Amino acid sequence: MPARFVFLLVFLILFMVVPSAVDLLTEWFWFGEVAYTDIFIRTLTAKATVGGLVFLVAFGVLAANFRLALGRVTKPYLLFPGGGDIQPITLERTQLKMLGTGVAALAALFLGLFASNEWLTWLQFQHATPFGQTDPLFGRDVGFYVFTLPFLDFARYLMLAVAVLSLIGSTAAYVISGTLALDPARGPVVGDGARRHLGLVIAVLFLLLAWGAYLDVPRILTTPAGIIHGASYVDIALRIPVLRGLLFVALVGSVLSLVTAMTPRNTPLFVAVGLYVLVTVGGNLGSV
């Protein structure tokens, strides 16, 4: 069974890599014809650096989360019950861990390929230069909005994707192990290990949401507002206070998630999610 998964993983990797290799070779010939090979090499190096770093970090985080959650499996998992002449298919814990590692590698590869397309964002951040002029609302140098803010957005979205995938994969693993279940009478039943793990992941998610609200405040100056570009009266009077409130609520949600991770109560987590949704919906309705 593991050999089949390895073969499938290799096939999927080749399916994604071969078309990219053809495009890469075509671009190499074109840049060589116009005598811009050095520019192509620099671009390629930036893509490989960004994509490789994102792949390594994402794979490490995802694989660690998946394998930690799958470590709670104590008995073979029935993947296919079989029937007639078809034998049932079961997976042992070691096989499930191998599968989890393969899924982590595949997800990290997708994230790495996506990140490699943002090579210019990385280079602009790496070689950022101040403009010597500040915006009148927040007092930040204009270079922050041109070079730094796009990179911070890019980094946050990647971290958010890794955190969400970690939460989804770990939750599925705990369901497989029976550590996480839904009881019609008692509601969610969560083992201590699963509670601590998932609570910490959700706390990280809330921190990333808080960071997003923090970045959304200066981003207002770079977004169109009706017929003008930048912050409007509604943005200054309403949206910015709402975003700062959302930042505070997300930080509170992170703390409440940690409380849920360390105690046998689910109420703090439900309160955290409810507060965040309430402030988000209220802010969107108020800005209409």
Residue ranges and their predicted role:
Residues 1-29, 38-140, 149, 153-288:
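Contiguous transmembrane helix-bundle modules in multi-pass membrane proteins
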